Amino acid sequence: YYNDFSMNKRSKVDGVVNFFRPLVAKGLPIDAIGMQGHMIYGDTDYVKEYTYSIKAIASIGLKSQFTELDLTMLPNPFGFSGANVSDNISYKDAMDPYKDGLPKEKQEQFDQFWLDFFQMLMDNKENVIRATFWCLNDANSWRNDFPIKGRTDYATLFDRQCKPKPAIQKLIDMVKDQEKKALKENKPNKNK
């Protein structure tokens, strides 16, 4: 098993796939390739990029795992990327605009992002074996202090009181709807 960051970037995933291709061909016991998912809302088209990554990894006969999933809705200071927790940028109010909660529009964007992301996972379920989150709730998320100490972030699917955010019920409903549709499509027609 191998797990790495920035696996949504085509050049990175291509490099990883090219590294593992001969090892897989030699029969090395590799179960999966993991992709850390510390995402920044609006930064890039993660669904499109990760779809490519899943397919690239599957092309060498391996499954994908998504690890460390979270999504910051806060502004990205100066195009900052990476997850070196020793990095720290000076606090500025403009970089912490949602101290009192996410505005409704931002919450809806957050929800839609996760609906789209999980739809991608479901569309690629034959090649994805796991998706896990980095933290259970917003109160304990590392995003509150990274890369700017003291910010208030909303990066998980559970709020600061461990209550599910609206995205949870929307995801449950999406899965139920797809299960119903699949059952209906697979139901034998008695009129034939």
Question: Regions from the language model: what does each represent?
Answer:
Residues F5-G15, H38-K48, L71-P77, A139:
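Acidic-and-aromatic substrate-binding clefts and catalytic sites of carbohydrate-active enzymes
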Residues R10-L23, N144-T156:
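Short, electropositive alpha-helical surface patch
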Residues Y1-V13, Q65-L69, R130-L136:
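Aromatic-lined carbohydrate-recognition surfaces of secreted/lumenal glycan-active proteins
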Residues K48-K63, L71-K192:
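Aromatic-rich peripheral "rim/lid" segments of glycoside hydrolase catalytic domains that contact
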